[in-house]
UniProtKB/Swiss-Prot annotation:
Component of the UAF (upstream activation factor) complex which consists of spp27/uaf30, rrn5, rrn10, and histones H3 and H4. Interacts with rrn5 and spp27/uaf30. Pfam families: UAF_Rrn10 (PF05234). InterPro entries: Rrn10 (IPR022793). Keywords: Cytoplasm, Nucleus, Transcription, Transcription regulation. This is RNA polymerase I-specific transcription initiation factor rrn10. It is found in: Cytoplasm; Nucleus, Nucleolus. Component of the UAF (upstream activation factor) complex which interacts with the upstream element of the RNA polymerase I promoter and forms a stable preinitiation complex. UAF seems to stimulate basal transcription to a fully activated level. It comes from Schizosaccharomyces pombe (strain 972 / ATCC 24843) (Fission yeast). GO terms for biological process: transcription initiation at RNA polymerase I promoter. One of its GO terms (cellular component) is nucleus. The keyword Nucleus applies. Its main location: cytoplasm.
Length: 97
């Protein structure tokens, strides 16, 4: 197993005493899931995690369980694909001019 991230996040601090605290996992080893391409950037995943935690704290929601690793990876893939599509559209529009 990988070591936990060294960067403290708000989610880690909130869940420091619970069993849901973040642990870095090797998805291939733990779940035998083939990874088709590179994982999302760790800084992007941390940013999504921090934003979601701050949003839940601000709105009074207590569902920190929804911030598990697979949800964060899924959101990371989604944001990465969305950004790639935006850049591609901008480049195509620029080439047309």
């Amino acid at each position: 197993m990988s070591n936990p991230p060294t960067r403290p996040t708000l989610y880690n601090l909130v869940n420091a005493d619970g069993e849901l605290s973040y642990r870095a996992r090797d998805l291939v080893q733990d779940f035998s899931v083939p990874i088709p391409h590179e994982l999302p950037d760790p800084d992007l995943v941390h940013s999504i995690q921090d934003f979601a935690t701050e949003y839940m704290l601000a709105t009074g929601k207590k569902s920190f369980e929804c911030l598990d690793e697979s949800a964060l990876l899924g959101l990371g893939y989604l944001v990465t694909e969305w950004m790639d599509a935006m850049v591609t559209d901008c480049l195509e529009e620029f080439e047309e001019r």
